[in-house]
Swiss-Prot record:
Gene: RGI1
Pfam families assigned to the protein according to its UniProt record, in alphabetical order: RGI1
Function summary: Involved in the control of energetic metabolism and significantly contribute to cell fitness, especially under respiratory growth conditions.
Biased composition (Polar residues): 31-40
Topology term for the membrane: Peripheral membrane protein
Species for this entry: Candida tropicalis (strain ATCC MYA-3404 / T1) (Yeast)
Name assigned to this protein: Respiratory growth induced protein 1
GO cellular component terms, semicolon-separated: plasma membrane
Length: 201
């Protein structure tokens, strides 16, 4: 179930050089309780347990909008409970075609070694570093895992660390979360899909 696209007018302009880091954790927002529902336990049929519904998926087609969404989730104290998707042409592709998508060569896709090398560089040196600035806390994705099929290649990253906060602080506010970042390209075009989730534990 996909959420609505966020319009440009909904957010403050993004300035990556001027984002304040998240210095300390706060209690879980009270509005989070509206996302809790009761379901029947699979382990003990007949009994109910409370679970947190998955967050609404927000979809974007511009990198700057996506990064602003991540920044806004931190500002709104929802940094541990969001799900965003980005469907875009990476900046190195747009630079090569002089911002004219009609000029993108059909060979610029996952089958091109140069495209894959450039995309991996973009992920490691730009996307993850920019997301870290937008989140306001440390991201520790490491090298990630590459999963490849005939039609697509996906870089999968997970961060299950303390994100630069002490265990005591995370325990005090019960703010433990995992981050998942998947970046996928296909053999059909230079379009790249990014899926970024922050999941409370």
């Amino acid at each position: 179930m996909a959420g609505k696209k966020k319009s440009k007018s909904d957010s403050v302009p993004l300035d990556l050089g001027n984002i304040k880091p998240l210095e300390k954790l706060q209690p879980v927002p009270k509005t989070r309780s509206s996302s809790i529902t009761s379901i029947e336990s699979a382990d003990e049929p007949g009994t109910m347990k409370q679970v947190l519904l998955p967050p609404t998926i927000r979809e974007f087609d511009e990198l700057e909008q996506f990064e602003a969404f991540v920044r806004d989730e931190t500002w709104d104290n929802e940094f541990d409970y969001f799900h965003g998707r980005l469907h875009y042409y990476p900046p190195f592709v747009m630079k090569a075609c002089h911002d004219d998508v009609e000029k993108i060569k059909p060979t610029v896709n996952k089958n091109s070694k140069k495209f894959r090398r450039d995309l991996q560089h973009h992920i490691q040196k730009h996307l993850i570093k920019d997301l870290e600035k937008c989140c306001g806390y440390e991201l520790n994705f490491g090298k990630g895992e590459v999963v490849e099929t005939d039609s697509k290649v996906t870089w999968k990253f997970k961060d299950e660390t303390d994100h630069g906060f002490s265990k005591e602080e995370e325990d005090m506010y019960d703010r433990h979360w995992r981050l998942e970042l998947d970046v996928t390209c296909t053999n059909e075009s230079a379009m790249v899909d990014v899926e970024y989730k922050s999941i409370p534990l």
